[in-house]
Each structure stands twice: as C-alpha cells, then as structure tokens.
C-alpha cells in the first residue's frame, strides 16, 4: 500500500474540469479541485476537504512498519555493514583442536551442521569464553559450530592474507576454475601457524562430508559455509561478491583434493561413514550430462597420463570445446565396496567418468586428480554385477584414501562384508556397548532422576553376610569335625551342595576365586572364605546361624551422580538402592584387607560392605563421594564434611558382629549419638578425649555389660625401652572386670619390671585409675576391643613416638634444606604432624603440602602413620614432603561454588577463633579498668574522709548530736540491707563477673587456692565486711553504745506513753554523752589508718600471688584410695 500523498488525475476528472472551464465566466479565477487519497482506512475525508492532515495513529503505524522492516544489529555486523563492538580473541590452535574434536564427536549426525544458524546471543556468550582452553560446551551443537565460524571470522588478520587471495584470483583470470597449481602455490605462501589451522579445519570438513547422508552437508555446502571464513576479501573491495565465488570453490577444491594438496594430512576412518561411491557417481551423472556410469568391463588409459595434474592452456582459447570442471568425488565416497580392482600397467579406454573426459572430443580437462583417480586407473578381472566400486578394509593404512589392493586373493571380500553388515552388532554404535550409557538410559526413564548428571560408574562386589561370624563359626566347626573321616565329610558335602541354590553357589565360587586370585587380599581372609565354602553343609544344617554364616559376593554397579548414589544389581539389572549424598554418614576403608570398605547410611544406620579388585578404585570412589557431599553442603550447611577413615575393619570388630567401627556395640549407638550432639565423634571416644568414667555413669541404664562380652581384646602400645626388646605393641584377651593395676602387673611380669613405674593412658593421654576396671571405662559396653598406652613415668614420651625422616622439596620456602628427622606420634593425624613440622621450620601455609609414604602412596590429612606400619613393621621410616597440586575443575558452575564454600568456611572458622580471642582479651581489659577505677574512687573517698574530722570539730554541740544520730541511722540501714536475702544474692552475682578458677579434676594436677571465707560466702570478702573488721575504733563503739541506750530508754518509757504527747517524746530522751574536747573528737574521727588498711586489703585481694605453693595443695595423679599410694606407703 502506498502511503505517500498523491493527486488523482484521472480521465474523468480532466473532462469535468474542462467542462467547468467552459461554463465559467471570464474574469473569475479558476481553482483546481484536487482529490486527496486517504491515509488510513479509519479516516474519512470528503472531496471538499482540501489539504487534510493525517492523524497521529496513522503516522505511528507508518513509523512502526518502517522500524520493524529494519535489519537487526547482529545481521548488520555479520554482513560487515556495521563494525563489531567485540574485540577479537587471539587465534590459538589448541582451541581450534578442542572445538573440532567436539564437533567430530557429537555433531556428525546433526542435519545442516555449520549451515543452520544457532542463537546469536548464545553464540556470543560462548564465544566470549574462548580466552582459556577450559570451556564448557552448550547443549545445542549448532551454537558450537557457529562459534567456531565466528572465532575465525572475527580475527583482524584472516588465515589467508588479503594480498595473497587477490593475487590468487588474478592468476585464475576472469571466470576461470580453481587449478591445482594455483591452490598449491597459495598454500605454500601461508605461514606455518595458519596452515596448521587450515589443515585442521579441512580435516573436520572432510569427516563431515563423509557423513553427508545424515547431515546433508557435501563438499559444496561446506565450501559455502567455510569459504568466507578462510578466504576473505577486503571489506572495501568493489568485487567482494564476485570474489566470494572463488572462496567457496577453493574450499570445496581443498576438501575434494586434500590428498594432493596436503599429502601429509591423515584423516582416520571412524567406522560410521554413510557415503558410498555409487551415490557420488549417481550425483555426478545427474549434474553433468557428459559423465557416464560404467556398466561393463572398461579399460582406462595409463596411470601416468591420467593422474598427473595439468593446467588448462586453452581456457580462453577458441577452437577446443572445453566443458566446465567436473565435480570431484570426496574421500567419503569409499564407505563400502563390491569388488577389489587390480592395478594394470597400461590400458586404453573410451570414457573415464572419474577423470572427466569429454566423450565427443576425447580431450582431458585440466583438473587436479581426485582421490578416486587412483582407483580409476585400474581394471577389474571379473564382470561387475552391480554398480558398487568397493574398497579394501583390511589395509594397513590409517586412511581410506590410501587403500590399494593388496593381493588378488582378496577379491572375495565382498562376501565377507555382506556377512558383517548382516550382523545386528554391526549396526550398533560405540556408545551402545557402554554400561554408563545403559544406566543413564535407565535413569532417564524414571520420573524423579531424569535430569541427573552422571559422574562415575564403578563395578564392585557387595558382601552379603558377616565375615567375622563366618570366621568364628568355621573355626568351631573345624575343631568339632576333626575326628570325622574324610569319606563322611565328602558325602555330606555333596548331599548338601545339591540342596543349595545354584545362584548362591555360582556367585560364591566366582567371587571367591576373585578374592583368592587377588594377591593384595590378606591371607587370613582368603582362608576364611575358602573354609566357608568347604563347610557349607554344616552351615546349612545349623538353622539358627544359617543366615549369619553365609557370605555371598554380588557384582553391583555404583553409579555416582550429582545428587545421589545408585546401586544397580547386575543379576536383575535394576536399581537396588538409592543413597543421597546428604544421607551418607561415613565411608571406612580396611587397612589390613586391601580392597575392603564399608558405607554407612546416616538415616537408616545401614552398614554395607563392598570389595573391589583394585584398591586404587576406592580412592576414585572416595573423591567422587566427597565432591557430592561438598555440593550437598551448598544447600544444607549443617552437613559435616565427608572424610574416609582407615582402620582394621575385621580386627577391630572381632566379636562385635562386624556392624560398626572402632569395635563399638549396636546397643551403644544412642550413647554415640548423644555425644555427637555435643561435638564428640566416635574417634574422640576411641582415643579417650571424652571422660569415659562420666559417660559410663551417665548412661549406665543403657550400657549394661553382658556375659558374652566379658572377654575383650585390648592392644597395648609399649614404651621404647630396652626391657621390651624392640616390641612396640602387644595384644591381650582380658576380662572387662580386671583392674588397671592387675593389667600393669601382667604386662610388667614377663619383662621383669616394677609395676609402680608405669601407668595406663588412652591415646590422647587421659590417665586410667589403678583401682578402676576397664569395664568402668566402657570396655565390654562401649567397645568390644580397645587400644591403650603403657606409659613409663621416667620417659612418658617414649610410647608411640618414633623417629621419622622427612625429605624436603626443592622449593625456595625450605631454603635449601634437604631432610629433617624428628620424633612424631604414630597415632596422631598427619595434619597435626604437618602443622608442627611447618611451625618448627617457620614455613607458612602447612595445608599446601602433603606427605608421600615409603611405598609412594599419598597420605590424607586424617591418616595416621601406624596405618602404614610405623610402630608395627618398623620403628623408623622415610617420608617425602611434596607440594599439593590443586586440580582445575572441568565444570565451573559446580566446582566454583564448592571451592567458594570451602574457602568461606575456612575464613569464617579462622575469623571466629580470632574473634573469640579478642573477646576474651577485651573482657580482661575491661575488668582491669573496672578494678583500677574502683581503687581510684577509693582513694578519692579517702581524701574526702580526711576533711571530715575538721568539719565535725567546727560544728556546735547540737549540730554534732544530729550528725551522730544520722550516722547511726545510716549504719542501721546498712545492717538491715545485709540481712535481706535478695540483696545478698545481688552481691553474690556481682562477684561472679570475674571468672573463678576451674574446678579441680582427678586426672590433671591443679593448684587449689585456700582463701579465707566469711559467712560461707566465698573466697572474696565484701567491702562492707572489710570496712567493719578493719575500722574498729572508739568512735564506732561509742555510736553503738548510744544506740543501745536509746533502745533501752524507749522500752522503759512505753508505760508512760498515755501521759506524754508524741510531739514531746524527744524531750524526755536522755541526752547522749558526748565528749566536748575538739582534740579528742578529731582523734576519734581519724579514719585515715583504717582507710589505708582497707586499700591494702583491696590490693591483696586483686593481685593474688601464686609464687609460693605448698606441696600439699597440689593434687596427685592418683586418687587417695588408689593402690599406688598403698604401694608407696608399703615401701616406706
């Protein structure tokens, strides 16, 4: 619709105007009657409305249509009309390699790859992440392809410089085809860096063209999309549109003839190519009428005359009839074959569809040879029944372009290929054989786990049953059946084996063989499983322990995702158990039986045991679980960090049923949960950080000893003294009711040592009383086994401490130090050892380093040196100190919040401890300032009191009486206030502002202060008591006597109250005898000596000196009723 103002000059209008002119009288001015077209259908103008103005709505509609028809800014930037605001990113081959590999891996089957445009905004956002090689690919593969084109196009200098491309076009001439010589000369002039990138792009393009039946991208289409990016013209060139034709043809020529242009470029065969030579020949036959498909046996010219590339010398000449350049077949056309041609030394032919001969004239065009020109120079020995031209798939070459026939006996390869293609397995892709792909497909079919991100997948063996009970049962059955004959045993075994289900026997035999073949499994465990199989008949006959004494190993897949841990049963191929990362409480690794570990569910308290063939799989599994817990902490910050614990699972659980760590009983779980609420872990209870005596007393109604747990195994760490002859640990099976003193005597009896010189302590140094039994500390109720230290009083640090030689890294922080030998505690976590070592060497940031064991294993922060054999196998070792290499995350969206949360937690923890220290220091300063202020005010009051005697001496007799009377009333009020209970409580609470000394403990020696107490109040006297006790002089005694006389007079005059008026009662009171001598009054009111004594006592109370300590005020390590005291008294 035309919206411009126009005048309607129709024929009828002209006739009407001429008639009006004829009838108009002369002298009148003629006025043309113009008709204005309508601006909008909504506005109605009459013919008489001359020069009407359009409305605002019509103008707005016109402008909106004009603005909507304008191209977008991105289109203008893409067409080089506007200059892009984005700065180009430096071209790097490493990034080109990453992008091309991703496209070759995921985008070969994408229809219209590089041709279909993605989201411009998403492409720009993805393109801006190209500053580093650690990029995260988007879901849409078209965005990746668009970003690759944008990355090459936005460079300030193209891959082929402008001058070189202009000279290349001038050599071809006007409308001339791309020749082999011209393109080879151009590639030889390009810099090696740019040439390497061009080869990588051509390789990706060839691989995509080989899959053109799926992605619909042949060599011509790839030339169209890559031509403007590789061969660019100047933006200001007048022939920019004509030059675009040469850029597209050049890329297509490079793709089709890459073997001749780039002889060193090798492109692998992926096995998923879909193009065949037959399809390419049919396409060329349809596009070029002068090409005929061979249907009969043909003989071509010699290879020397057909392969050599020759340039056309008569492109512009007149006489010879030259057809356009025939499209060469790309390398992807040799996907399948039907016959195997044999090279012929020389032959003649009338037509050659590959080389591009003209049938009418017989001349050969000046085109570079295609990859099929090598095959075109051959002749077949048999008649071709089909139109397929086959290739050899068993050649030693890595590229199908170099496939040449090997031997005439390989002519029957067609039958073999047909057999292979008929197999259903040949139609399957590589990912179809991946168990991770199958499990992810299984999850996608579910409703709640459809969007789970899969991290890792592990194949392990799940242990069903109890290894410890099997060990105990097999030992008892072996002794009971030792007198039986071998024939009876074999018959019973064979009879019971038939009754056993086949599934259990097969799983046991397969899993047990894997255990026996694994050399790293402990020998006792192997014997244990073999004995369990041999005694299966006896186990089945025992109905009470049938379920508890059978151990089965079931193959299970553990699939770890971003939110959950899935357990897939391989027998039923279904999800058996789902464990969220937030419910995973702990993972424990057995240090004796390599490959055995357990996982504890924090909600259901279900403990599952697993076995892996390679112990290194456990490290990978633990890392994935720790990563999942760190992500779960982002939403629930109350979760604790997951750390694997390493200790002997089977040995520490002996007799406990193997259901818990550290040998604890199932009945004691409420006790450990109650301690966990107070911040104590199971390790703290095991090491004796908690006062076990108080714990057992508090939970005595739960911790009830049973007769089965009377005998427990206790391991003692012995001191490094010559009497023990190099033995550092020893285990005993003891009764839980045995006293500590008897145990010490038992240990020292064989070594012929004096028991009074030794003590028993926990791993953390808490002393066990000699008159207490181990059951009082929780043995038999909290633990089924325990670990204690035997301490020699002469050398208390010799137990559990060993010399370790640390090899230092060659970094500037250590200032050339090569090694350092120190004595460390073998049962202390490595993070404490590292902190002590770095503090001694004055090296900051001890958490930047980790220790490498003697066998090259990397130890964790919570590992102990006893787990690698220190103190068990050897008494000294060498360890290497190395700097940690922090990994780079592959998923910034998940890793960055996780690392940020860890760093924030560390900063908050350090800041909180610093705040606590500053808070305590501030309280100390405030208390000191308050005490200083009180002392200063006391001196001020003393200075004021010095003027009181002089002022009282200046008073008259009556004024003195009133002063004494007011002073006595004030004294009585103070005495009344002291008798009020609420006032006393307020005074007592004010004393508790200053923290008192901690209560004495029987385990640690503390100084007991003996301060004088008044009225049973406490160690600090009140100021009122100090004042009354110190200021005893005649003046105050006189005031007290006057008060007594007044009370007696009031009692004596009670009978005369009816005759004496209330207003005259004061006149009948006997006057108080007062001394009139001013000097005596000044002497009585001299409070200076009392005040000075008050200040002195205040200073003594504020600064309590402890330099002189009485020996009887120090507690002994052993209580009064201990047998140690009886032993010492007996010696005396």
From Swiss-Prot:
<dbReference type="GO" id="GO:0007264">
    <property type="term" value="P:small GTPase-mediated signal transduction"/>
</dbReference>
<feature type="domain" description="Rho-GAP">
    <location>
        <begin position="76"/>
        <end position="262"/>
    </location>
</feature>
<dbReference type="GO" id="GO:0005886">
    <property type="term" value="C:plasma membrane"/>
</dbReference>
<dbReference type="InterPro" id="IPR000198">
    <property type="entry name" value="RhoGAP_dom"/>
</dbReference>
<dbReference type="GO" id="GO:0005737">
    <property type="term" value="C:cytoplasm"/>
</dbReference>
<feature type="compositionally biased region" description="Low complexity">
    <location>
        <begin position="328"/>
        <end position="354"/>
    </location>
</feature>
<feature type="region of interest" description="Disordered">
    <location>
        <begin position="279"/>
        <end position="354"/>
    </location>
</feature>
<dbReference type="InterPro" id="IPR008936">
    <property type="entry name" value="Rho_GTPase_activation_prot"/>
</dbReference>
<protein>
    <recommendedName>
        <fullName>Rho GTPase-activating protein gacE</fullName>
    </recommendedName>
</protein>
<keyword id="KW-0963">Cytoplasm</keyword>
<feature type="compositionally biased region" description="Low complexity">
    <location>
        <begin position="281"/>
        <end position="301"/>
    </location>
</feature>
<keyword id="KW-0343">GTPase activation</keyword>
<feature type="region of interest" description="Disordered">
    <location>
        <begin position="472"/>
        <end position="517"/>
    </location>
</feature>
<feature type="compositionally biased region" description="Low complexity">
    <location>
        <begin position="507"/>
        <end position="517"/>
    </location>
</feature>
<feature type="compositionally biased region" description="Polar residues">
    <location>
        <begin position="302"/>
        <end position="311"/>
    </location>
</feature>
<dbReference type="Pfam" id="PF00620">
    <property type="entry name" value="RhoGAP"/>
</dbReference>
<dbReference type="GO" id="GO:0005096">
    <property type="term" value="F:GTPase activator activity"/>
</dbReference>
<comment type="function">
    <text>Rho GTPase-activating protein involved in the signal transduction pathway.</text>
</comment>
<feature type="site" description="Arginine finger; crucial for GTP hydrolysis by stabilizing the transition state">
    <location>
        <position position="115"/>
    </location>
</feature>
<feature type="compositionally biased region" description="Low complexity">
    <location>
        <begin position="473"/>
        <end position="498"/>
    </location>
</feature>
């Amino acid at each position: 619709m035309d919206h411009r103002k126009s005048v309607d000059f129709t024929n009828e209008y002209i006739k009407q105007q001429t008639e009006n002119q004829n009838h108009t009288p002369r002298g009148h001015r003629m006025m043309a009657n113009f008709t204005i077209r309508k601006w909008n259908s909504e506005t109605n103008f009459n013919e008489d409305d001359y020069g009407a103005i359009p409305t605002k709505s019509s103008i707005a509609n016109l402008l909106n249509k004009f603005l909507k028809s304008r191209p977008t800014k991105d289109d203008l930037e893409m067409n080089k009309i506007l200059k892009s605001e984005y700065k180009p990113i430096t071209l790097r081959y490493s990034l080109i390699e990453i992008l091309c590999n991703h496209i070759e891996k995921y985008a070969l089957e994408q229809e219209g790859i590089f041709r279909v445009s993605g989201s411009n905004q998403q492409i720009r956002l993805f393109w801006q992440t190209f500053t580093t090689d650690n990029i995260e690919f988007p879901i849409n593969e078209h965005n990746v392809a668009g970003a690759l084109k944008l990355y090459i196009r936005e460079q300030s200098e193209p891959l082929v410089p402008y001058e070189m491309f202009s000279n290349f076009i001038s050599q071809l001439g006007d409308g001339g085809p791309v020749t082999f010589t011209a393109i080879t000369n151009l590639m030889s002039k390009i810099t090696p860096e740019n040439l390497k990138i061009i080869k990588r792009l051509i390789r990706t393009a060839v691989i995509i063209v080989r899959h053109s039946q799926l992605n619909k991208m042949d060599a011509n289409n790839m030339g169209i999309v890559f031509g403007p990016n590789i061969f660019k013209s100047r933006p200001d060139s007048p022939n920019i549109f004509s030059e675009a034709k040469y850029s597209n043809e050049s890329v297509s020529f490079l793709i089709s003839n890459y073997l001749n242009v780039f002889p060193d470029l090798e492109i692998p065969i992926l096995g998923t190519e879909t193009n065949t030579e037959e399809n390419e020949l049919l396409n060329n036959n349809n596009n070029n009428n002068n090409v005929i498909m061979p249907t009969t046996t043909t003989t071509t010219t010699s290879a020397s005359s057909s392969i050599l590339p020759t340039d056309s010398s008569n492109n512009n000449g007149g006489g010879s009839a030259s057809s356009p350049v025939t499209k060469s077949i790309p390398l992807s056309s040799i996907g399948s074959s039907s016959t195997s041609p044999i090279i012929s030394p020389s032959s003649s032919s009338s037509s050659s569809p590959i080389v591009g001969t003209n049938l009418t004239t017989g001349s050969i065009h000046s085109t570079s040879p295609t990859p099929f020109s090598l095959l075109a120079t051959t002749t077949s020995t048999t008649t071709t029944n089909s139109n397929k031209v086959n290739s050899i798939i068993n050649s030693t070459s890595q590229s199908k372009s170099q496939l040449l026939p090997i031997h005439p006996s390989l002519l029957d390869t067609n039958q073999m290929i047909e057999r292979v293609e008929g197999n259903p397995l040949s139609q399957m892709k590589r990912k179809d054989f991946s168990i991770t792909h199958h499990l992810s497909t299984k999850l996608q079919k579910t409703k709640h786990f459809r969007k789970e991100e899969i991290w890792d997948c592990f194949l392990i063996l799940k242990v069903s049953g109890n290894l410890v009970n099997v060990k105990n049962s097999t030992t008892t059955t072996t002794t009971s059946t030792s007198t039986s004959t071998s024939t009876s045993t074999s018959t019973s075994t064979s009879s019971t084996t038939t009754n056993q289900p086949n599934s259990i026997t097969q799983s046991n035999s397969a899993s047990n063989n894997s255990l026996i073949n694994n050399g790293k499994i402990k020998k006792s465990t192997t014997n244990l499983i073999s004995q369990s199989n041999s005694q299966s008949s006896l186990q089945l006959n025992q109905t009470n322990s049938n379920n508890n004494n059978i151990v089965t190993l079931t193959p299970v897949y553990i699939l770890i995702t971003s939110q959950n841990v899935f357990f897939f049963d391989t027998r039923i191929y279904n999800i058996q158990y789902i464990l969220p990362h937030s419910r995973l409480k702990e993972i424990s690794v057995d240090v004796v039986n390599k490959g055995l570990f357990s996982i504890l569910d924090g909600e259901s308290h279900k403990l599952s045991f697993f076995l892996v063939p390679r112990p290194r799989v456990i490290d990978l599994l633990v890392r994935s679980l720790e990563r999942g817990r760190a992500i779960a902490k982002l939403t629930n910050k109350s979760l604790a960090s997951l750390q694997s614990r390493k200790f002997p699972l089977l040995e520490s659980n002996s007799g406990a049923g193997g259901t818990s760590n550290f040998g604890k009983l199932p009945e004691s779980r409420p006790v450990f949960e109650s301690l966990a609420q107070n911040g104590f872990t199971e390790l703290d209870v095991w090491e004796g950080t908690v006062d076990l005596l108080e714990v057992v007393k508090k939970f005595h109604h739960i911790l009830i000893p049973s007769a089965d747990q009377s005998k427990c195994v206790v391991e003692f760490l012995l001191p490094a003294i010559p009497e023990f002859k190099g033995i550092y640990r020893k285990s005993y099976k003891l009764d839980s009711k045995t006293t500590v003193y008897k145990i010490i005597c038992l240990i020292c009896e064989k070594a012929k040592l004096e028991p009074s010189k030794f003590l028993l302590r926990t791993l953390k140094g808490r002393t066990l009383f000699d008159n207490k039994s181990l059951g009082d500390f929780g043995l038999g109720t909290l633990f089924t086994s325990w670990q204690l230290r035997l301490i020699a009083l002469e050398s208390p640090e010799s137990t559990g401490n060993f010399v370790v030689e640390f090899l230092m890294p060659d970094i500037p922080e250590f200032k050339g130090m090569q090694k350092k030998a120190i004595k460390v505690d073998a049962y202390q976590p490595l993070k404490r050892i590292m902190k002590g070592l770095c503090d001694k060497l004055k090296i900051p940031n001890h958490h930047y380093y980790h220790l490498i064991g003697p066998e090259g294993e990397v130890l964790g922060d919570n590992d102990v040196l006893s787990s690698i054999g220190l103190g068990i196998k050897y008494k000294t070792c060498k360890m290497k100190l190395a700097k940690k290499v922090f990994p780079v995350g592959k998923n910034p969206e998940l890793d960055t919040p996780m690392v940020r949360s860890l760093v924030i937690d560390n900063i908050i923890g350090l800041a909180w401890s610093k705040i606590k220290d500053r808070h305590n220091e501030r309280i100390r300063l405030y208390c000191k300032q308050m005490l200083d202020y009180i002392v200063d005010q006391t001196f001020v009051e003393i200075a004021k009191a010095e003027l009181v005697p002089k002022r009282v001496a200046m008073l008259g007799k009556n004024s003195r009486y009133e002063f004494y009377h007011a002073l006595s009333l004030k004294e009585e009020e103070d005495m009344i206030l002291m008798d009020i209970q609420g006032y006393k409580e307020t005074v007592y609470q004010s004393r508790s502002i200053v923290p008192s000394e901690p209560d004495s403990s029987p385990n640690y020696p503390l100084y007991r202060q003996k301060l004088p107490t008044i009225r049973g109040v406490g160690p600090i006297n009140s100021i009122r008591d100090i004042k009354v006790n110190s200021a005893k002089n005649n003046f105050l005694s006189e005031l007290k006597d006057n008060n007594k006389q007044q009370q007696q007079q009031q009692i004596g005059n009670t009978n005369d109250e009816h005759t004496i008026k209330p207003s005259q009662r004061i006149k009948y009171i006997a006057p108080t005898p007062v001394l009139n001598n001013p000097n005596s009054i000044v002497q009585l009111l001299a409070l200076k000596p009392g005040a000075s004594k008050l200040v002195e006592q205040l200073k003594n109370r504020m600064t309590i000196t402890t330099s002189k300590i009485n020996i009887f005020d120090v507690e002994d390590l052993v209580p009064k009723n201990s047998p140690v005291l009886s032993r010492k008294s007996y010696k005396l």
